[in-house]
């Protein structure tokens, strides 16, 4: 009797290529729902020592969740994140997050996905619109910056220094599972460090601009090298441009997040309108 050979398991590269061909630009990814509890918000804010945020969404991997709801677990590397803030979520309201594939492309042989999400609460209040770019697989950092344009700064904001304690690191790594939000595996070390870098950039802008940033602010960050636990990092920002738009002042900034070894962890740009266009 002839033994019929078993088909070979696809290599990771082949699996990513198959997945990349499967997804379509504009494809809807379904929804994620969760309730914002006082315990959830308190634990998030107290752990990162950042009480003004209100956006517990920053610790919830909404974009990962809507993608895995449809396609299961996929190894992804965060490359950049672009947030537009409407209003911080209100305690005890349910949040519904819808997701879709905004774009996909190949660069230097690596496949990229752009996932968009929109979070609203149970009475239709818009909370947060996010666009996240991922490379498929576990890949090295991009080693590029979106904040490297040479320009003479108008103003330098006071720098923010943060100590990354282990309990802060672990909270972000396991936040979804601790509060039973969706069904995701814990974040990788790289993803945890990237998300903390984004959160700290958000904190610096909130400390400076308050509700003018939390309602109507735009933050766009590229991840370069992950932050590390049990270390400090420094977040700096400088104002590059101030202009007048329809009786509002528009402020454009450049942001850098650096590790204690002076390695660039993330760089970004932000835009704030004063007064905020969102009431």
Predicted regions and their residues:
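Short structured motifs
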Residues: 16, 79-86, 100-101, 218-224
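Hot-dog-fold acyl-thioester-processing enzymes
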Residues: 2-79, 139-218, 277-279
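Structured beta->alpha junctions
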Residues: 33, 225-227
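Long amphipathic N-terminal alpha/beta scaffold segment
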Residues: 70-76, 86-89, 227
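HotDog/MaoC-like acyl-thioester-processing domains
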Residues: 2-24, 86-167, 229-279
């Amino acid at each position: 009797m002839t033994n019929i050979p078993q088909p070979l398991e696809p290599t990771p590269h082949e699996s990513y290529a198959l997945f990349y061909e499967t997804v379509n630009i504009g494809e809807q990814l379904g929804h994620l729902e969760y309730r914002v509890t006082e315990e959830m918000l308190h634990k998030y804010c107290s752990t990162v020592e950042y009480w003004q945020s209100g956006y517990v969404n920053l610790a919830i991997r909404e974009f990962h969740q809507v993608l895995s709801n449809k396609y299961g677990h996929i190894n992804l590397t965060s490359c950049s994140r672009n947030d537009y803030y409407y209003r911080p979520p209100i305690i005890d309201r349910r949040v519904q997050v819808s997701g879709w594939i905004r774009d996909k492309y190949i660069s230097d042989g690596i496949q990229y996905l752009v996932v968009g999400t929109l979070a609203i609460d149970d009475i239709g209040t818009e909370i947060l619109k996010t666009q996240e770019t991922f490379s498929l697989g576990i890949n090295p950092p991009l080693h590029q910056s979106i904040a490297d344009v040479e320009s003479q700064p108008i103003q330098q904001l006071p720098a923010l220094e943060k100590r990354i304690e282990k309990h802060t690191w672990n909270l972000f790594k396991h936040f979804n599972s601790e509060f039973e939000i969706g069904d995701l595996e814990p974040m990788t070390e790289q993803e945890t460090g990237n998300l903390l870098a984004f959160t700290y950039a958000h904190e610096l802008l909130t400390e400076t601009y308050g509700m003018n940033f939390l309602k109507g602010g735009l933050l766009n960050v590229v991840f370069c090298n992950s932050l590390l636990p049990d270390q400090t990092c420094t977040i700096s920002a400088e104002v590059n441009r101030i202009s007048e738009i329809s009786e509002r002042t528009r402020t454009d900034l450049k942001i850098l997040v650096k590790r204690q070894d002076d390695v660039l962890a993330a760089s970004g740009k932000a835009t704030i309108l004063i007064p905020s266009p969102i009431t």
